[in-house]
Every structure is written in C-alpha cells, then in structure tokens.
C-alpha cells in the first residue's frame, strides 16, 4: 500500500486553531462501519448512540508543558521538546539548534535562562538531558515549559491552552500531545453517560512527539512506528472482558486508547486481553485484525498520517476516505481542536485495500 493512497485535499481554513467555547458542543460525524452510512450531529448525541453497559475506554495521560526555550552556554539558541521524562532529573528530548549539542554541553533554559542543564548523551535522534536543579523535572517543566501545541496550530501557546489542551479526566503526567478525542468530554456529559449506565475505564498512553512525525516512506509496510509507553491495568482488562461477556460494546475514546487496548490484546497469551505495561510500537493499517474494539470516537486526522490508516483499518478504506471527503465538503473542523467522529466497526475492513 502506498502512503499517497491516504491523501486528501484539506483547505487551511478547516484547521481548527482554537477549540469550541464549550467542549461537548463540537460537531459529530457518525460513520456506520458495515454500510458506510453517514449522519451529522453534535457530540452530545453520544448519549443516544451508547447503550447501558457499553464500556468507554479513555486515556488518562496528562500533557506536560514540554516545550522549553533557551540557549547553549556557548551562545546558540535552542528549543527543547521533551519526548519522555526518564526520572526526577533526566529527560529524553528533541533539540532544535543551528548545531546539535555534543555530550557535556551546558544548556541555559527558561525565559530568564535561570535553569541549568547538561546534555549527557545522544540516542539516535533524541538527546538525554540532565537538570542541575534540586526540583523534580515535572516541577521545572511546570515552571518554565510551554504547552506543546501541534505544529499545524500555527500560533504561540497561550495560558488558556494549559486547561483547554487537556482532558477533564487527565491524571498521569507524561504526554507531549493530548489524546484529542477526549477533549470533547466535559463533566456534565460524563455525568449524563454514567447516569445512563455507560461504564468507563482508563488506560494510560503517554503520547510522544513522534505522533506528529510524517510518514517518510512511500510504502506503508516500510514505515517504522515510534515507541510510546502504555499501561493497561487489570481493572481495564476485567471491564473489557465483562462488557464482552454481557454482549456490550467496547468503545475506544481516541486512537491512543485503541493502540493501548490492541497492544494488550497482541501481548496476551491465552485470553482476549491481558494487562500490559511497557512500550508499544503497534502500527495499525488496512489488513489489521482488530481484537477488542467495537466502536471508536476520534477526531479528524492529517492526510497520509498513521492515524487515518488506523481508522481505515477499522471502518474500511473506501468508507473512511468518503467520510473525510464529506467532512471537507461540510466544513467540519480538523485536527486536535477540531470536530469528532463516532465510528462502528466494519468486519469487512480487514479484506479491503486501497
């Protein structure tokens, strides 16, 4: 399969630079997987689409203020984007500079350059950085870091983004990008879903900066997926198995929840799914056999991205590309701060190729 098979025309005017004033008031395009039928509505229509006993699986990662600005002690300006917190003193990061720093290079970070750090090692495209500061890494990031808005949101981050680019149920700090399907849930909607009898469970996948990297090969099968840390605890496994046993659906909120659950299913030895704690490089594209997910809530993704490939593997290639064409025609808002889709599984998708 060719990467260009997943391309589509997207006017810049449809890229959302700010979220809707009310989280749950975004538009919702529903795609019926087996038939390809499309319906238009608003996000709160989920109340009618979900049944008592259905299980929503959320990603409770919390976005950290992962973008730092500063300079090398020798003078050159740098931008640091944290990929992962290694411990209380060290991070793994992308560093943008006119000349890549060498091990031992001193870095002065923050608007006032008051935070001292040292680049200690290089791991491929990533740099290991150690802070020379008594505070834990997370405290330093909260003090001097900027919210790492995606590259297609072409504006500086604002104070409001610290709340808006965060799900209301975020709990475990570690992501450098929000699991954006979850941004549409507010407390009243969550309360209404619970009232209806919809079950909820929480995985953790710390979204890395690799999620924004373009696919740089021509053939999908040649792409090497970036690695991200995921946790699927026993209580999630129990909730999934219980939902399946009673004939209810497992509904993933976002592609990160999909990748977490499917990673846990791939690693399972005997059961459908088992607990999973570790790095995952799962790459889902047409031909993949889904094991756990029955429905998916997700935003609209970039052309030629691994995420539109994941959706195509779930709903079917033709149905997915037709839905995106319709979304563009109907002027849906795209990407992180944009509108959402509700998609049910297409069992024929596994045999469909572009």
UniProtKB/Swiss-Prot annotation:
Enzyme Commission no: 2.4.99.17
Cross-referenced NCBIfam families: PRK00147.1, queA
Lineage: Bacteria, Pseudomonadati, Pseudomonadota, Gammaproteobacteria, Enterobacterales
Quaternary context: Monomer.
UniProt-listed SUPFAM superfamilies: QueA-like
Protein's name in the database: S-adenosylmethionine:tRNA ribosyltransferase-isomerase
Reactions mediated catalytically: 7-aminomethyl-7-carbaguanosine(34) in tRNA + S-adenosyl-L-methionine = epoxyqueuosine(34) in tRNA + adenine + L-methionine + 2 H(+)
Domain of life of the native organism: Bacteria
InterPro entries referenced in this protein's UniProt entry, alphabetically: QueA, QueA_dom1, QueA_dom2, QueA_sf
Location relative to the cell: Cytoplasm
Group of enzyme by EC: transferase
GO cellular component terms listed in the entry, alphabetical order: cytoplasm
GO biological process: queuosine biosynthetic process; tRNA wobble guanine modification
GO terms for MF: S-adenosylmethionine:tRNA ribosyltransferase-isomerase activity
Similarity field: Belongs to the QueA family.
Pathway as given in its UniProt record: tRNA modification; tRNA-queuosine biosynthesis
One Pfam family per UniProt: Queuosine_synth
Name of encoding gene: queA
Keywords, sorted A to Z: Cytoplasm, Queuosine biosynthesis, S-adenosyl-L-methionine, Transferase
Keyword hit for Transferase: yes
